[in-house]
Amino acid sequence: MARKTPIERYRNIGISAHIDAGKTTTTERILFYTGVTHKLGEVHDGAATTDWMEQEQERGITITSAAVTCFWKGMDMSYPEHRFNIIDTPGHVDFTIEVERSMRVLDGACMVYCAVGGVQPQSETVWRQANKYKVPRLAFVNKMDRTGANFFKVVDQIKTRLKGNPVPVVVPIGAEDNFKGVVDLLKMKAIIWDEASQGMKFEYADIPAEVKETAEKWRENMVEAAAEASEELMNKYLDEGTLSEEDIKAGLRARTLAVEIQPMLCGTAFKNKGVQRMLDAVIDYLPSPVDIPDVEGTDPDDEEKKLARKADDGEKFSALAFKLMTDPFVGQLTFVRVYSGVLSKGDTVFNSVKGKKERIGRIVQMMANERIEVDEIRAGDIAACVGLKDVTTGETLSDVDNPIILERMVFPEPVIAQAVEPKSKADQEKMGIALSRLASEDPSFRVRTDEESGQTIIAGMGELHLEIIVDRMKREFNVEANVGKPQVAYRETVRKTVTDVDGKFVRQSGGKGQYGHVVFTLEPQEAGKGFEFVDEIKGGVVPREYIPAVEKGVIEALTSGVLAGYPVVDVKVRLTFGSYHDVDSSEQAFKMAAIFGFKEAARKANPVILEPMMAVEVETPEDYAGTVMGDLSSRRGMVQGMDDMVGGGKAIKAEVPLSEMFGYATQLRSMTQGRATYTMEFKHYAEAPRNVSEAIVAARAK
């Protein structure tokens, strides 16, 4: 089966934005204009095509990124047919993991901003992630029809807040109620959309007198940006004073792909204006799989050995599993991005991370909530496979004889935990299955059993994250659950170095005894460095075969600190000395000796409790700014700054301990009459003040 669309005409793009910038509506319009959906779905009615979990439709926010395939020939049908794979990404800070995961498999991104709200905190997080994966991007300023819309203010904010380099390729005609259309700065024509045909029809017109000067100024800016792409274009521009449409496109494309500039467009998705021109810009400026560097990976047998794969059907097969979903009809769906080669249904592939073979049952391409079965997928494709038994997010699938591990994604540690139990005892097993399914879909969500209480503990990235998990258990698996009060994931560490601490485990009272003896030095490491074990035994005073048992013992002891039983982090343990008995020593004895030795050393090394600190940003009308700052300070928060917002109001940044943020949403609503919003994400662990840690220790001792 030959390829229908040449790979140069593929565009794998993500659409990402802050909540309520109108991202899902924008995606809906794309699907409408590209002919995938015949009736427009509105988030307002809970009928958007990409929001396919019931909860997303109820809450009007997108939680999981659905991958949708569609085709586009340009708004005036002037392009050959291009194939878009669009990944709709969530904009809520509790779901940053989803965004991170989508960024990994995208070639380009479309950042949607609200013309009134401008660059909001979540937009900064997404921008940082796009920088991390070097994703070329466009910016689309949506909601130009809303009161207070200001396109140029958003251009400014992208420069100042995100340190971006935006280059408008259109400018708006009018704003708010009289937003009519845009001026295309390449053609220097006005584009006016026809509302009756829901934006399917449009006309080119002369530029209205009132925007002529603005259009000329920004065209000059755009041509200069394009000219900087190469010496050749710069000379042409200096000689002729302008550039042709082809040259401008080529220059802007080269600089966008190099992540030097971001072409900017505007419109209103809800009123069907401007999205069509944005789709043309995706073709003009965003990369095809061939335009990005070859994907790199390592050899599973030799981590030092770097391998690369070209985006070519002739290459050996490699793909990345970037999302798992449980589907009501076919069971587990594994979304994959194919980087090289061809995958046909029935093929056997190799999961190079786990070292296991997998057989591909069926392959489906997603048209939002419709599925189309296909026989094969090729380099550059994004599709879902059915029938993979043991693949988790971020793992590589490759050719059986030519394995490769594409980079692993790094997932954040959860910061909030809750005990959860089924409402009826009979559902215990069902709940276990549901939670392990959900954990395999979402690596930032963890499940464990508390040894002491036997309770099931779920942990995640925020209150909303866990709320949605519990909600999904009820809807998708019919398990109703009660949840306990949220618990903060505290940690412990030590502050001073102690040397020569003995750990002994001796049971010798006739017959086969037990004997293990170790001597440790315990020292603190800098924050985030993690645990390190160093074997400094000389002359075999502790035999080689027992060293792994000693390390195992220390690792076990790390799970429960000496102050309040929280996990211990950022310490270095040196095994410096010890002794053994020919008959009575065993691995178990040395493991026990190591546990005792570590606990003893930790007690002497000035142990402290660490608490998670959150970066909190509150957007509030100016009248309430003082109240909000006072409240944050009373929560042991450090206010770090205050910025002005586009549509008036203040953005307050602070660092606040997570333990003080429970129930903040309700409190903030009542303080500001529901007019302020906030986002919060984990920043780092910091030492808890003495009175706080004493309270934590006392609470654990009860």
From Swiss-Prot:
KW Repeat (keyword) present: no
CDD domains recorded: EF-G, EFG_III, EFG_mtEFG1_IV, EFG_mtEFG_C, EFG_mtEFG_II
Residues annotated as domain tr-type G: 8-290
UniProt entry keywords in alphabetical sequence: Cytoplasm, Elongation factor, GTP-binding, Nucleotide-binding, Protein biosynthesis
InterPro entries: EFG_II, EFG_III, EFG_III/V, EFG_IV, EFG_V, EFG_V-like, EFTu-like_2, G_TR_CS
Pfam families according to UniProt: EFG_C (PF00679), EFG_III (PF14492), EFG_IV (PF03764), GTP_EFTU (PF00009), GTP_EFTU_D2 (PF03144)
Residue numbers binding GTP: 17-24, 88-92, 142-145
Leader peptide range in chain numbering: none
Subcellular location: Cytoplasm
Alphabetical GO biological process terms: ribosome disassembly
Superkingdom classification of source: Bacteria
Similarity annotation: Belongs to the TRAFAC class translation factor GTPase superfamily. Classic translation factor GTPase family. EF-G/EF-2 subfamily.
Gene3D superfamilies membership: 3.30.230.10, 3.30.70.240, Elongation Factor G (Translational Gtpase), domain 3, P-loop containing nucleotide triphosphate hydrolases, Translation factors
One term under GO cellular component: cytoplasm
Protein name listed in UniProt: Elongation factor G
PANTHER family: RIBOSOME-RELEASING FACTOR 2, MITOCHONDRIAL, TRANSLATION ELONGATION FACTOR G-RELATED
Role description: Catalyzes the GTP-dependent ribosomal translocation step during translation elongation. During this step, the ribosome changes from the pre-translocational (PRE) to the post-translocational (POST) state as the newly formed A-site-bound peptidyl-tRNA and P-site-bound deacylated tRNA move to the P and E sites, respectively. Catalyzes the coordinated movement of the two tRNA molecules, the mRNA and conformational changes in the ribosome.
GO molecular function: GTP binding; GTPase activity; guanosine tetraphosphate binding; translation elongation factor activity
Gene that encodes it: fusA
HAMAP family: EF_G_EF_2_B
PROSITE patterns in the record: G_TR_1, G_TR_2
